[in-house]
Amino acid sequence: MRVGQLLRFRSTSLRSSTARQEYVPHHKPVVEDDIKRLEDFLLSKPNVLVLTGAGISTESGIPDYRSEGVGLYARSNHKPVQHMEFVKSSAVRKRYWARNFVGWPKFSATQPNATHHALARFEREERVQAVVTQNVDRLHTKAGSRNVVEVHGSGYVVKCLSCEYRIDRHEFQSILASLNPAFKDAPDMIRPDGDVEIPLEYIENFRIPECTQCGGDLKPEIVFFGDSVPRPRVDQIAGMVYNSDGLLVLGSSLLVFSGYRVVLQTKDLKLPVGIVNIGETRADHLADIKISAKCGDVIPKLFDFRNSKSVS
């Protein structure tokens, strides 16, 4: 039987806007007064720092983990790979890379949505200092944002666990393809880290290259669950908070501490925090302004009817 026949499962299309919205949780229409309130909040803070989570990428067709009814925890019993499991188990590494290989073409083809593009525009207009993102999808960079810090790393880089070797994920995909010619059909169900679900019988024969420098094991440059954000990155973000005049959180429940910590650092400096997210967040009690809405209904509409600031 052909691999393509066995790889069929729940399939979704990212081609239409309707399909892209299927990963967006149920939400109410935005109140226009809320957009005005957020504009006023930002107008007095030209050096605001933006923290983004998976909620801004759901409108691009990448599901988050936790959203009720549409997140991956609601759709599947499969849990994300743990860092120590990946490091210690060759079977876990093989399973991860097989799924990631199949899902990569779809994941890497995902395009920024209106919120990503709006944030890139705000940076050009000097309305925001930078973007700190919990996402690994590089959509901010694709949209044109230049000052981006990826808290949890990037799915677009592969690193060796034993030395400093790095390789671009697209190049690594070509190597995997040459080693595994049978895996040519790509399922459509994407996890936030590019992972997908495929039959176990095909994972057993999947081949993974070793590091060309030292023969070590290769891993995406992503902070897996159970791992810690590198200290230099934590310190870099803390410095950005210190140099900001406020924080705007977009599309994050802030349940992961690496994101919540940024809010705590901001409030420790007695700086204001704004939040736009569908549903509650861990930091609602700390927010100076909270809007429960889809980011795409709010952020692209900001400053629409105001003259852009002149940028030298």
Curated annotation (Swiss-Prot):
Cofactor(s) required, per the database record: Zn(2+)
GO molecular function: histone deacetylase activity; histone deacetylase activity, NAD-dependent; NAD+ binding; NAD+ poly-ADP-ribosyltransferase activity; NAD-dependent protein lysine deacetylase activity; zinc ion binding
Any one Pfam family match given in the protein's UniProt record, by short name: SIR2
Cofactor binding note of this UniProt entry: Binds 1 zinc ion per subunit.
Record's keyword terms, sorted: Metal-binding, Mitochondrion, NAD, Transferase, Transit peptide, Zinc
UniProt cross-references to SUPFAM superfamilies, sorted A to Z: DHS-like NAD/FAD-binding domain (SSF52467)
EC number: 2.3.1.286
CDD domains in the record: SIRT4
Reaction catalysed by this enzyme: N(6)-acetyl-L-lysyl-[protein] + NAD(+) + H2O = 2''-O-acetyl-ADP-D-ribose + nicotinamide + L-lysyl-[protein]
Gene Ontology CC annotations of this record: mitochondrial matrix; mitochondrion
Stretch forming the transit peptide: 1-16
Residues noted as binding NAD(+) in the record, renumbered to the chain: 53-73, 134-137, 251-253, 277-279, 295
Broad class of where this protein is predominantly found: mitochondrion
Assigned protein family: Belongs to the sirtuin family. Class II subfamily.
Function: NAD-dependent protein deacylase. Catalyzes the NAD-dependent hydrolysis of acyl groups from lysine residues.
Name of the protein: NAD-dependent protein deacylase Sirt4
